[in-house]
Amino acid sequence: MIITVCKGKIHRAVVTEAELHYEGSLTVDQDLMDMAGMKPYEQVSVVNVNNGARFETYLIVGERGSGTICLNGAAARLGMKGDKVIIITYGQVEEKDLPNDYQPKVVFVDENNRPKKA
């Protein structure tokens, strides 16, 4: 049986921008994407800790080391600058092939979206 598991997560990142009139997506600092094993244009789930909104979009690479977390397009209606969000990617795997000790790549960030630990 194929199951869907959390592949990577950026935990409690702070939204730095919201650009309503931009191509719909989520721009994320490439350093954070790399640490969480996320790829450009990969589908992500975003959970807004402040207002409870949950939505899906795809990733656009942001400048390395910038701390950028930008809600673009319609997603800008679901959050605002300063909101905390959780960004999650998923993968599918045969259940029998998933090791019992499997752990997703999780990146915890500070208030400036700098990694605390991964």
UniProtKB/Swiss-Prot annotation:
The modification Pyruvic acid (Ser) is found at S25. Keywords: Autocatalytic cleavage, Cytoplasm, Decarboxylase, Lyase, Pantothenate biosynthesis, Pyruvate, Schiff base, Zymogen. It is an enzyme of class 4 (lyase). Substrate binds at T57, G73, A74, A75. It catalyses: L-aspartate + H(+) = beta-alanine + CO2. Pathway: Cofactor biosynthesis; (R)-pantothenate biosynthesis; beta-alanine from L-aspartate: step 1/1. The keyword Chloroplast does not apply. Its cofactor is pyruvate. Its EC number is 4.1.1.11. Pfam families: Asp_decarbox. Binds 1 pyruvoyl group covalently per subunit. One of its GO terms (molecular function) is aspartate 1-decarboxylase activity. Its main location: cytoplasm. Belongs to the PanD family. Heterooctamer of four alpha and four beta subunits. NCBIfam families: panD. This is Aspartate 1-decarboxylase. It comes from Leptospira biflexa serovar Patoc (strain Patoc 1 / ATCC 23582 / Paris). The lineage of its organism: Bacteria, Pseudomonadati, Spirochaetota, Spirochaetia, Leptospirales. The gene is panD.
